[in-house]
Amino acid sequence: MIAFANAFPYFEKINTSLLGLSIDSNSSHLAWMHDIYCMTGIVLPFPIIADRNGSIARKYGMISNDISNTETVRNVFIIDEKGIVRVILIYPMNIGRFIPEILRIIQALQTSDCSSYPIPAN
């Protein structure tokens, strides 16, 4: 989440909202956000949803029962303004997300939505 916070201005520049979700409690989120601030000075500039019963996480396939039925896996969902899930990225718990690739995907989707040209690699 720190990487997303650091890249927040780039997401804003491409008209993209960020939202975090976990099945931890509000108090757990507040303590975690406080720890991040105390250790790094970073304030998370986007909301974090406390999905206590896991209903949202289950609907989006974020809980891998073969790993744990109480922890979400690291997912990134790119959802367009119509509410359509356009991209799902699933990361192992021990691998961080690659923010430049996420930004590239969003920009590629935005560009391809406005033209009939495919977006090349790299």
Spans of model-derived segments:
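Chalcogenol-based redox active-site neighborhoods
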Residues: M1-N122
